[in-house]
Amino acid sequence: MKATSSPHTPPTSGSSELKGARILLVEDSWHVGTAIKRLLRILGADVSGPAATIADAKRLIADRKPDVAIIDINLRDGEQANPLLDRLQEQDIPVIVITGYTSVSLPPGKVEAILQKPVSVEQFLAILRPIVARLPDR
């Protein structure tokens, strides 16, 4: 995540904007995963992960079905997240893809959004907020 100079930066603590949202985070970069997880927790989300592999992500999904998934499409050792996208789509879990690549080809309807790294906090939240807002019990 990159910070911007916008006056609309998120609060640093105590926010409940995403309270109760169960979010699966799949990211093989420790630094990126930690930054995203910290932001989501500050905003009140319950975050599983970051999972660095598809196998880890599948275990987290089985342990606790997420409301939303945030996934880096290319993981360690060239592992592609497409099989994970299929599983999440079968369970009607909205997916946000984050990637360092300028071009990503995914079948239509698999993801809510594709964000290119580095992603600003504002860009990230502009996509995530409406997804969380339409979850049941919101």
Question: At which residue positions do the language-model features occur?
Answer:
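A Lys-centered signature of the CheY-like receiver
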Residues: 117
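Conserved phosphotransfer cores of two-component systems
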Residues: 62-64, 87-93, 104
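Conserved acidic carboxylate
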Residues: 27
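Non-catalytic signal-transmission and effector/linker regions of two-component phosphorelay proteins
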Residues: 1-22, 55, 120-138
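Two-component/phosphorelay signaling modules centered on CheY-like receiver
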Residues: 30-49
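Hydrophobic/aromatic residues positioned on beta-strands within the core alpha/beta folds
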Residues: 98-99
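Acidic, metal-coordinating helix/loop segments flanking the phosphotransfer/catalytic sites
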Residues: 50-68
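Conserved phosphotransfer microenvironments
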Residues: 71-89
